[in-house]
Design a protein with these regions (language model features):
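Non-catalytic cap/lid and distal C-terminal segments of serine-dependent acyl enzymes
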Residues: 22-283
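Bacterial Sec-dependent N-terminal signal peptides
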Residues: 1-27
Length: 283
């Protein structure tokens, strides 16, 4: 009996020591307790169909039941979905770390603009109007552009800058990670022709839907961050966008570092984007 009791106490003590060591190892990580992740379907009147999105609330949303919070919209790339970011990155920890609501909508293969040829792909209206209105009416968010940001990867980087540059009254801050910011350089890729038409016969439409060609319309005031890797196939067009913004005297952050068109790069880059937005929200 004494041997059994001693063995039990030893196992209990060892378990407590293991737990203590584990707790020390994660002491610097964000503790996520009350965070809520919703998967919602938002009805688009423009497209006459529902579009899904993931909404991530921070712990603070529950700790402070009367407070409102900034919102960050995070867009996926081509061939992706609204599930990509929550699957690849701990968005709950990010939401709690910065005290923000994060929204990851489905963009299908839309390039996040309103297609001039396909009424079922009107994603600029969805992102910049219908989705924002839904989020602001269902969650405790600040309803002004200063406290609203948008970013994304690849096609989503294009979409984030496209929507922000065209709607500065909606998004006060914006970012891009490995963004396809000049679609005219890639006329036979990623179903873009299904959204605008064949490049050879619709060159003007392609030019009008390229982010880089929006630069002459911009005014200083938005907080802009652009991020890409040296080994990315979008590296050159991002450098061109950086130069265009400099020539137009539009303030922005531009980061180039080792990396390619990979999730390894984006899951690292999102941390810098979120820090940038947090500083903008605090101004």
């Amino acid at each position: 009996m004494k041997r059994k009791l001693f063995a039990y106490l030893f196992v209990l003590f060892a378990g407590e020591m293991t737990l203590a060591c584990a707790q020390q190892n994660v002491a610097t990580q964000v503790k996520v307790v009350n965070v809520q992740t919703d998967t919602v379907e938002v009805m688009s009147q423009k497209m006459n169909r529902g579009i899904k999105a993931v909404v991530v609330l921070p712990n603070q949303h529950f700790d402070n039941p009367t407070d409102s919070f900034p919102t960050v919209y995070v867009l996926h790339g081509a061939w992706g979905s609204y599930r990509d970011w929550p699957t690849k990155k701990n968005m709950e920890a990010i939401a709690t770390k910065y005290g923000v609501v994060i929204v990851c909508p489905d963009g299908q293969d839309s390039w996040y603009f309103d297609s001039p040829i396909d009424p079922k792909f009107q994603f600029e209206t969805f992102i910049s109007k219908e989705l924002v209105e839904y989020v602001d009416s269902h969650y405790r968010t600040f309803r002004n552009p200063k406290m609203r940001a948008i970013t994304g990867l690849s096609m989503g980087g294009h979409g984030a800058l496209w929507n922000a540059f065209r709607h500065p009254d909606v998004f006060g801050s914006c970012g891009s990670m490995s963004g396809g910011v000049d679609i005219t350089k890639f006329p036979n890729k990623w179903k873009i022709d299904q959204r605008i038409g064949k490049y050879e016969t619709n060159k003007q439409a392609w030019a009008e839907h390229a982010v880089i060609n929006l630069v002459p319309t911009l005014k200083a005031g938005q907080n802009i961050i652009i991020d890409d890797g040296y080994s990315d196939f979008f590296y050159e067009v991002n450098c061109n966008l950086h130069k265009a913004l400099l020539d137009a005297k539009i303030p922005h952050d531009f980061t180039i570092r080792p990396g390619a068109h990979t999730w390894e790069y984006w899951t690292n880059a999102i941390d810098y984007q979120m820090l940038f937005f947090a500083k903008a929200f605090a101004k």
